[in-house]
Design a protein with these regions (language model features):
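Acidic, metal-coordinating catalytic segment for phosphate/diphosphate chemistry
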Residues: 1-35, 41
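A glycine-rich, hydrophobic loop/mini-helix early in the fold
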Residues: 33-65
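Nudix hydrolase/Nudix homology domain
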Residues: 58-59, 70, 97-104, 109-169
Length: 169
């Protein structure tokens, strides 16, 4: 069973945990998620396509990410998520934390912080090992291609993270 730490509105750990996807959070309580934008030096971005069996946003494009596990730092979580979903070790990549945004869903028990990271890494495609339970393909996309996926409504979280793509230019 996976557990997540519970944070207060200032992103301070409360010392309490919740079961994964339990959605028991009160207003003013949050869990922590991470997103890792991975770029090549040529300015293209590694994006993955969600499997069609996902309950939410199947077939959409996204960057690697997920929830931080109890006791895990944000940085540890993003490194784990990128490794699990793509097989890439970003430990020695350039970059790091960029910004945090907060998502509140009053009365739904699902409030969360999202720490957004950006890494630049010279990626050899043979190094990619996609997590088949999560991903159904990948591409190295330009900023314009990602913007077009977003306009089509098939790129997850774009409005919340678009500035991380703009900052790489």
């Amino acid at each position: 069973m996976e557990y997540w730490d519970i944070y207060d509105a200032e992103k301070r750990p409360t010392g309490r945990t919740m079961k994964r996807n339990d959605w028991c959070l009160k207003d003013g309580e949050y869990h922590l998620t991470v997103l890792g934008v991975v770029a090549r030096p040529d300015g293209t971005y590694l994006i993955t396509k969600r499997v069609m069996t996902k309950a939410w946003a199947p077939g959409w494009w996204e960057v690697s990410g997920g929830a931080a596990q109890a006791g895990e730092s944000s940085e540890e979580a993003v490194r784990r998520e990128v490794r699990e979903e793509t097989g890439l070790d970003i430990s020695n990549a350039e970059g790091g934390y960029v910004f945090t945004y907060k998502r509140e869903n009053p009365g739904e028990g699902d409030n969360y912080f999202v720490d957004v990271y950006r890494f630049v890494l010279d990626i050899d495609e043979s190094e990619l090992k996609l997590q088949t339970e999560e991903t159904d393909g990948y591409m190295f996309a330009t900023k314009e291609e990602i913007e077009n996926f977003a306009k089509e409504g098939i790129f997850l979280h774009y409005d919340s993270i678009k500035r991380v793509f703009e900052q790489l230019q």
